[in-house]
């Protein structure tokens, strides 16, 4: 900033903006530290994988994999976990990622497949597909919270990786923006549920819509909120059929809409959480049985531990 800028904004404002710019530079340097460390170990390019819609009771599960360039001049300003960004910022950063990434891949798993596989299995399946769909084969894969078995590349899970690793943050943005756009399209098809507002997650308004209209084909029957709404709707129809005012309905016992075999609702379908740890520290693969290396990792996890 030159003298004219200082005169226009004032010294205090200029100092504040300089501090803000410096803080953002340091944040980005820190966000890319995993890619730098892996590059020093000869492991590049690095893919980051994350999903959107895991906890929603309607709509698809979307998984993205992204490989960013390692050149510091190619860093994406403002990149962060999608949950920390405004919708407008996500859209802007999404466009930057798509235009500047070495490779990216998106997998959309419909609600019917989520019900069939279960949320956790669908998530892992989507991660495998997303990595396999990359045009550039990664030398290493970093995931947010869950490791992926069966890849051709070694990989590790990072606690809160979408907050701590650039390529995972990029994947979180791509997955989130893609899914939000799909939910807006579903809103046009099923406007009574207001999917464009809550994006398929459980809210008071979404519960009220389910109570009024029952589930639509985009709702996940494996989630207890949806099953209960479906059961109430079946009961209401049966009560109408049994009443004298509705002779046109066939009578019969009330039946709740079942979920898929073996499902126990959203609580049990939710995936096991990653081992506890501060954001940006790799999960200890020896202490977390289901968060372990793929078996073909030639370097121990400790090599990537960063204080």
Swiss-Prot record:
Binding site residues for a divalent metal cation: 50-51, 144
GO molecular function, one term: RNA binding
Primary enzyme class: hydrolase
Transmembrane segments: none
Top-level taxonomic group: Bacteria
SUPFAM superfamilies: Ribonuclease H-like
Compositional bias (Low complexity): 250-280
Catalyzed reactions per annotation: Endonucleolytic cleavage to 5'-phosphomonoester
Coiled coil: none
Cofactor(s) the protein needs: Mn(2+); Mg(2+)
EC number: 3.1.26.4
Keyword RNA-binding attached: no
CDD domains: RNase_HII_bacteria_HII_like
Annotated S-S bridges: none
Subcellular location: Cytoplasm
Basic and acidic residues bias spans: 287-296
InterPro entries recorded: RNase_HII, RNase_HII/HIII, RNase_HII/HIII_dom, RNaseH-like_sf, RNaseH_sf
Gene Ontology biological-process annotations: DNA replication, removal of RNA primer; mismatch repair
Pfam entry (one): RNase_HII
Residue ranges occupied by any RNase H type-2 domain in the UniProt entry: 44-235
Cellular component terms (Gene Ontology): cytoplasm; ribonuclease H2 complex
Keywords: Cytoplasm, Endonuclease, Hydrolase, Manganese, Metal-binding, Nuclease
Protein name: Ribonuclease HII
Organism: Acidothermus cellulolyticus (strain ATCC 43068 / DSM 8971 / 11B)
């Amino acid at each position: 900033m030159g003298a004219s800028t200082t005169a226009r904004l004032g010294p205090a404002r200029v100092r504040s903006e300089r501090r803000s710019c410096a803080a953002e530079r340091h944040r980005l340097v820190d966000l890319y530290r995993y890619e730098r460390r892996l590059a020093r170990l000869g492991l590049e390019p690095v893919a980051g994988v994350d999903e959107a819609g895991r906890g929603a009771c309607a709509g698809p599960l979307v998984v993205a994999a992204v490989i960013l360039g390692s050149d510091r001049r190619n860093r994406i300003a403002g990149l962060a976990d999608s949950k920390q960004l405004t919708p407008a910022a996500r859209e802007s950063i999404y466009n930057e990622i798509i235009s500047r990434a070495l490779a990216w891949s998106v997998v959309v798993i419909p609600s019917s497949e989520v019900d069939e596989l279960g949320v956790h299995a669908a998530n892992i399946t989507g991660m495998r597909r997303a990595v396999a769909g990359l045009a550039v084969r990664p030398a290493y894969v970093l995931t947010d919270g869950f490791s992926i078995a069966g890849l051709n590349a070694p990989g590790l899970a990072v606690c809160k990786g979408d907050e701590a690793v650039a390529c995972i943050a990029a994947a979180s943005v791509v997955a989130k923006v893609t899914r939000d756009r799909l939910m807006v399209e579903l809103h046009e098809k099923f406007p009574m549920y207001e999917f464009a507002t809550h994006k398929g997650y459980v809210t008071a308004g979404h519960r009220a819509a389910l109570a009024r209209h029952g589930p639509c084909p985009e709702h996940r029957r494996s989630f207890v909120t949806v099953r209960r709404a479906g059961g109430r709707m079946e009961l209401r129809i049966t009560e109408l059929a049994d009443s004298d005012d509705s002779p046109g309905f066939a009578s019969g016992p009330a039946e709740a809409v079942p979920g898929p075999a073996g499902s126990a609702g959203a609580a049990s379908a939710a995936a096991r959480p990653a081992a506890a740890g501060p954001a940006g520290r790799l999960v200890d693969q020896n202490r977390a049985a289901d968060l372990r290396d793929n078996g073909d990792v030639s370097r121990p996890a400790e090599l990537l531990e960063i204080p």
